[in-house]
């Protein structure tokens, strides 16, 4: 069984997404927005596991295991007003000095540095309420100031403080074209921390989110209220097997171990279809889908929540959750068909991992009782396109030296030389990641990795003296 998971919501994006996520989780577990159980009898035996995401007291009052953080109060205030008495007020952090990140990663990072003890103290106290703490999930954007900067500072601190706990992120990347020029700076700086400190990163981008929202919702005026429902749907589906456990995939570690073949290749692309009234409001009516149809449709680029060039991608690992009226024979038939369509490198297990998820028994009955929905997480080569887009925009702006003065803030950037060095080093880290993904497409990938490891061991051995001690250089 999985342990407890603490959700960290950083910045406006993270807290907006969190608002929809907790609404969804509460609905699936028959919990009201005030935290009270909606089951008719408190003695009713539950068919779910609330413990990974909720604390429960003796009066059947549920409280999310969540920490809300922002540099300004408006979004968190909106969340608290919507869910009165639901969140623990001790788990809310807003910058007390009125500082704003102002779309600058450096400002957000500096705010995190100056307030790190206070934030970590809240996290430590929340961990104290757990019995079998498994890890964190961070909700944030990499493009703004707080989500990227404060989020980066938090990733570094948690990786150092809790090195054996799983650190997952749900990270929203900007569209290729953006009104805020410095978003490319923020993205590269945050991406470095995702590469170095996250164990698994589920990637979204605004272009794909807006495109899918236009097809899913009846409302022609698409905004963040719609895209955030899509993100919360993915998080709900990823954690379905943890909250409605079976004998497989009942923990974060069991899910991500199927997807991540090596530590650096931990960026995952989500897909989902169809978005039904179980997850979103004001959805467009659609015909019923069989398990077979859903599994094949998940491979369609139009159902991916991250924009990537899908021409003949190489898949390293695939994990599906199929929820609803699932027919095992159709799952087997679909897997046979998909094995013929998906290109795996020879070093990969070439296995498609499928979780038969459980639809919450507390949700209203669907108009179509045979409805099936599916979520797919893919570790595949084309995610590198997201990083290439970020790098291309970054390179153009950085070459001109534009807006660098905005980042000469705090202890990390004490001089303009510090700014230049940090930007250059972060760009190199991202470049190395892209090269790793390209190399992983080759059948010789694992052989090359082993050779590199042996060479590194050889270099270390050469630095030892006759007694086996490290030489002083």
Curated annotation (Swiss-Prot):
Residues 43-56 have a biased composition (Basic and acidic residues). GO terms for biological process: cytoplasmic microtubule organization; meiotic spindle organization; microtubule nucleation; microtubule nucleation by spindle pole body; mitotic cell cycle; mitotic sister chromatid segregation; mitotic spindle organization; positive regulation of cytoplasmic translation. It comes from the Eukaryota. It is found in: Cytoplasm, Cytoskeleton, Microtubule organizing center, Spindle pole body. GO terms for cellular component: cytoplasm; gamma-tubulin ring complex; gamma-tubulin small complex; inner plaque of spindle pole body; microtubule; nucleus; outer plaque of spindle pole body; spindle. GTP binds at residues 143-149. Gene3D superfamilies: Helix hairpin bin, Tubulin/FtsZ, C-terminal domain, Tubulin/FtsZ, GTPase domain. Residues 33-56 are annotated as: Disordered. Signal peptide: none annotated. Keywords: Cytoplasm, Cytoskeleton, GTP-binding, Microtubule, Nucleotide-binding. Present with 7200 molecules/cell in log phase SD medium. Belongs to the tubulin family. Tubulin is the major constituent of microtubules. The gamma chain is found at microtubule organizing centers (MTOC) such as the spindle poles or the centrosome, suggesting that it is involved in the minus-end nucleation of microtubule assembly. TUB4 is an important spindle pole body component that organizes both cytoplasmic and nuclear microtubule arrays. Interacts with SPC72, SPC97 and SPC98. This is Tubulin gamma chain. The gene is TUB4.
